[in-house]
Amino acid sequence: MLILLAPPSNRGTEIAARCKSYVFRKKNAVHFIFLEKVLYICSVIHFFLLMIERTEYMSLLEKWRDKKIIKVVTGIRRCGKSSLLRMFREKLLVEGVSEQQVQELNFEDLDNEPFLNYKALYSYVKKNLCPGKMNYLFFDEIQMVDGFQKAIDSLFLLDNVDLYVTGSNAYLLSGEIATLLTGRYVEIKLFPFSFNEYLQSMPSDANIEAAYREYIEKSSFPYVLQIKNDREMVREYLTGLYNTIVLKDVVSRRKITDVMMLESVVRFLADNIGNISVIKRISDTMTSLGRKIASHTVENYISALTNSYIFYSVPRYDAKGKQLLKTGQKYYLVDVGLRSVINGTKGGDLGHVLENVVYLELARRGGEIYVGKIGDAEIDFVVVQGERKAYYQVSLSVRDEDTMKRELEPLQAIPDNYPKYLLTLDNDPIVFHDGIKQQYVLDWLRNL
């Protein structure tokens, strides 16, 4: 009966098979399985089937499971950090970990307000540890606990503790805290849904180009999938999310008093994704529009915005001189759907939107990302992973001969033999131009 609860998918079949195996083991025991346990397992199946399977992130958590290292999941609010840990928690329970071995605390929940002090938190958790077994501790938005690093550090010293924490602000791993935890943590950077993950919510025969248009017009935030057919609800949700991030994670933490000026900077960055931006130029632009602002204030605002993960900054790299450049960066939004909420942009600028989508996918895949410069030409992305590099150009279309030439020239000028890619929305077969791989970007986004 349990197998019938799961639809004909690999994910459902796998979970149902685990549950069936569990039932068979219990039948061989002295006592019959309790009905409540069966119902619990059924609820776990239902929970898993409602979720988009975030395979890469789940694999990372499994890789570091039971290792003496703190798993720190970071990312913007509502990108799925809590859901990811909940999925992993349920996976542990299905695999035989007892509920007594798991402690889960969300510090945005008022019920957990008594533990917003490191001493109270440590005392409570230690008192409820299951002796003689591994204990799995899940702490959501841990940065809200005053002195949280002391509690984490003390719990880390216990042999039977496996720690998982989340945070929506880079403060979690900044300054003294990062120094204190050096060598004791691994950061798992979580983003809203990738295009490939988004496709899991759609029929297998969905039109891929229509799906991409929906992806960039609506949003990649997980909750939007539940309301995506109601445009007004999507806009209201994203507006509320944006306001929460700006007011709670930026204004409150940085004690910013001129909120209107901050929002002017936000709108400038959102309107200029994919363009080289210099702090002084932003300051001068604001001043020319009648909003006088000092360069150091712009710099502080941008720092606060990137720390809240709403924007990502990408420095420039001289591909020939092999060194970082001190001036000029590009900024990308964590979700292109937020752009219409921020500045009312409707359509247009699809080239920079595509570039933003590619940047986020590269960030998910790991490595240091830079904007490349070679002579007077620009390479959209240089990705460095250890000793390896890869170069990427992104273009809506290169079917025009002049456009093709313009996009290929910077890649052809690079004096090394690392992989080079030209990603476009032209739905053409893969072709190589003197070693440069041209690929349909929607296939690349799906790892095809």
PLM feature spans:
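Pre-Walker A adenine-sensing motif
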Residues: I52-R65
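Short glycine-rich substrate-engagement loop in P-loop NTPases that contacts/grips substrate
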Residues: E104-G132
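Interdomain motor-coupling "hinge/lid" segment immediately C-terminal to the ATP-binding subdomain
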Residues: E36, S168-A170, S174-I276, Y309
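Hydrophobic anchor at the beta1->P-loop junction of P-loop NTPases
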Residues: V73
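Hydrophobic positions on the alpha1 helix immediately C-terminal to the Walker A/P-loop
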Residues: L84
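Conserved lysine of the Walker
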Residues: K81
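Accessory nucleic acid-recognition modules appended to NTPase machines
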Residues: R231-K389
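Structural recognition of the conserved hydrophobic beta-strand(s) that form the central parallel beta-sheet
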Residues: D162-S168
